[in-house]
């Protein structure tokens, strides 16, 4: 048994361990936050779909720019040829009312992919059609049945540099970097507001070679409410924690290893002494 424990301790000495700490985030970080999104709305066409953002200060931006693109999909989720446009451009000028009605009748969808930056403040980004409210009102006045089906798939959401996120996931097992990836929700009711509440936690990863990676992990919860008179919308409401998680890779220290080995031998001699005393009393 002692030999086994000695071998285990000796082998354990060469195993890289990870220490976690919860600290106050007093780092001088950037004033902006990059958000990476890949989202499919399965039953709302690209013609009347936008990504909007607003923050704690009340600032609101419609039809955000960045690198976001919209790709039209057919009812089976296949890409419609040559139908791709950047958000922030005058895509809304490139269609007719007949195009929109046809897209709804064909159950077309839309995939939004790319990145954009927001102020590093509590806020939200939302997938919505209220920018096109006058057009939607016109359709309804004509008696056209515009059905807002919010069924969607979140292929990917992350924060800051995508390359760093991928690298950290390869090097570390700790943290929750992309918990929403692959999430699918069916919602074919016409009067819903879907809210995702996201708690973002600044995180620092220190590799065994002391190289440091900055990232953001996050958790979320989802809640559905009645939209009332609003156009059905999906909100991603985020808040940034004042605390920071730190993960540090390290080898066990020489002193700790020596103490454990001494404890093994000490235990071995103690057991041997007790056994010897028992045998002397018996015999």
List the model feature ranges, each with a label.
Residues 1, 13-19, 278-283:
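Helix-loop boundary elements of multi-pass alpha-helical membrane proteins
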Residues 1-7:
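Hydrophobic membrane-insertion alpha-helices, especially the h-region
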Residues 5, 15-18, 96-99:
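Eukaryotic beta-rich interaction modules
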Residues 7, 11, 38, 42, ...:
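Amphipathic alpha-helical interaction motifs in eukaryotic regulatory proteins
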Residues 9-33:
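Alpha-helical transmembrane signal-anchor/signal-peptide segments
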Residues 29-31, 38-226:
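Soluble non-transmembrane domains of integral membrane proteins
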Residues 215-283:
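Membrane-proximal extracellular juxtamembrane segment immediately upstream
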């Amino acid at each position: 048994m002692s030999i086994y424990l000695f071998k285990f301790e000796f082998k354990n000495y060469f195993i890289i361990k990870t220490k976690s700490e919860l600290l106050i985030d007093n780092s001088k970080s950037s004033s902006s936050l990059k958000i990476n999104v890949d989202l499919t709305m399965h039953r709302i066409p690209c013609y009347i779909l936008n990504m909007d953002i607003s923050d704690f200060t009340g600032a609101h931006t419609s039809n955000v720019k960045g690198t976001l693109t919209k790709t039209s999909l057919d009812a089976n989720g296949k890409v419609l040829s040559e139908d791709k446009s950047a958000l922030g451009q005058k895509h809304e000028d490139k269609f007719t009312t007949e195009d929109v009605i046809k897209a709804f009748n064909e159950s077309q969808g839309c995939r939004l992919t790319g990145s954009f930056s927001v102020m590093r403040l509590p806020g939200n980004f939302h997938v919505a059609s209220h920018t096109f409210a006058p057009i939607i009102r016109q359709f309804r006045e004509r008696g056209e049945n515009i059905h807002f089906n919010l069924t969607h798939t979140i292929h990917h959401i992350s924060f800051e540099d995508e390359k760093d996120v991928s690298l950290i996931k390869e090097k570390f097992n700790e943290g929750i970097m992309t918990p929403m990836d692959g999430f699918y929700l069916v919602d074919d009711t016409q009067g819903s507001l879907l809210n995702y509440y996201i708690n973002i936690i600044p995180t620092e990863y220190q590799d065994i070679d002391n190289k440091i990676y900055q990232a953001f992990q996050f958790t979320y919860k989802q809640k559905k409410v009645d939209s009332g008179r609003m156009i059905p919308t999906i909100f991603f409401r985020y808040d940034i924690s004042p605390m920071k998680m730190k993960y540090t890779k390290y080898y066990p220290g020489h002193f700790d290893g020596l103490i454990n080995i001494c404890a093994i031998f000490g235990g071995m001699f103690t057991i041997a002494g007790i056994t010897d005393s028992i045998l002397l009393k018996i015999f």
